Amino acid sequence: MAKVLVLYYSAYGHIEQMAEAAAAGAREAGATVDIKRVPDLVPEEVAKSAHFKLDQKAPIATVAELAEYDAIIVGVGTRFGRMASQMANFLDQAGGLWARGALNGKVGGAFTSTATQHGGQEVTLFSIITNLMHFGMVIVGLDYGYGAQMTLDEVTGGSPYGATTITGGDGSRQPSAIELDGARYQGRKIAETAIKLHG
């Protein structure tokens, strides 16, 4: 049975919700799924004053354990058109895995959030996907089999490069049903691909 890791960083809980949806989709495909987060780099007193969501139940991941999974789905919010430094810092530490080819042929995908529709969703997805491709991973996005990403009836995230959500400038907008379903769909597709490739 394929093992899938949903690896995320979420300051305010939006990406945490998307991670849970992606994990649910991967489980629907029959994969064994773990949800883990990367360590925060923000001092706790600063995180508290900024009202970060500090009660996230997912355990902290280690770089070494990435090699144990058949698929890794990476979720992180956008910071000025790129992935947040917490995730970049974590992935930067995977040079040893890269050097050994430990992630070659594994399946990967990405999801993100932005404050606005034009806040850099696709650029952030590319920044994640670029890392995964350097690791030798096979990338699975949010294909147009998920037709709801084509809706014009409401503000919604979504891209063929990965599931996304829009948070609003103050973070008050929570992931919509369409956005969560997109993450679930992508998680299922990634797990299905991992099962085909790795059993």
From Swiss-Prot:
Tell me how the cofactor is bound: Binds 1 FMN per monomer.
- Spell out the protein name for this chain: NAD(P)H dehydrogenase (quinone)
What keywords does the record list, in alphabetical order?
A: Flavoprotein, FMN, NAD, NADP, Nucleotide-binding, Oxidoreductase
The record's GO CC annotations read:
membrane
Span of domain Flavodoxin-like = 4-190
Binding annotation for substrate? 98
- One MF term from GO for this chain? NADP binding
Question: Which EC number(s) does UniProt give?
Answer: 1.6.5.2
What Pfam family is a match for this entry?
FMN_red
Record carries keyword Nucleotide-binding? yes
Q: Where does FMN bind?
A: 10-15, 78-80, 113-119, 134
Regarding protein family, the annotation reads: Belongs to the WrbA family.
User: Domain of life of the organism in this record?
Assistant: Bacteria
What catalytic reaction does the record list? a quinone + NADH + H(+) = a quinol + NAD(+); a quinone + NADPH + H(+) = a quinol + NADP(+)
Matching entries from HAMAP family are given as:
NQOR
Q: Which NCBIfam families match?
A: flav_wrbA, PRK03767.1
Per UniProt, where does NAD(+) bind? Answer: 12
Does the keyword section mention Methyltransferase? no
Q: Which cofactor does it need?
A: FMN
Please state what class of enzyme this protein is. Answer: oxidoreductase
